[in-house]
Amino acid sequence: MRHRHGLRKLNRTSSHRLAMLRNMSNSLIEHEVIKTTLPKAKELRKVVEPLITLGKKPSLANRRLAFNRLRDRDSVAKLFDVLGPRFANRPGGYLRVLKFGFRVGDNAPMALVELLDRPEVDETENVQEAE
């Protein structure tokens, strides 16, 4: 029986799984929205939400804990300088996982993972800049 095992193995070794989730976390923090498979997205939520909670309390110890998990200075800086203050009043649930259809090659269920309260990008400004 597999009672109380809260982790999906995702058909990977533990080191590969750790590296994959670390890379996906860094990508999500940098771009604020990523597209991946649904099981990976659900596991990513378990990794990123505690990191954002760490970012809400800016201390040296929390920065070191976040760096230990992310291993990227730019991601840690954004986590504490941008995302922590943005989610200061939200008690949890910082991510949204949206089902995004199925992948063409293998029909794997896809998902869009995004941070909530993202600043809206005005598309008319982008069109004017392109012209």
From Swiss-Prot:
Gene3D superfamilies: Ribosomal protein L17. Pfam families: Ribosomal_L17 (PF01196). GO terms for molecular function: structural constituent of ribosome. GO terms for cellular component: cytosolic large ribosomal subunit. SUPFAM superfamilies: Prokaryotic ribosomal protein L17. Keywords: Ribonucleoprotein, Ribosomal protein. GO terms for biological process: translation. Belongs to the bacterial ribosomal protein bL17 family. NCBIfam families: L17. HAMAP family: Ribosomal_bL17. Part of the 50S ribosomal subunit. Contacts protein L32. This is Large ribosomal subunit protein bL17. It comes from Burkholderia cenocepacia (strain HI2424). The gene is rplQ.
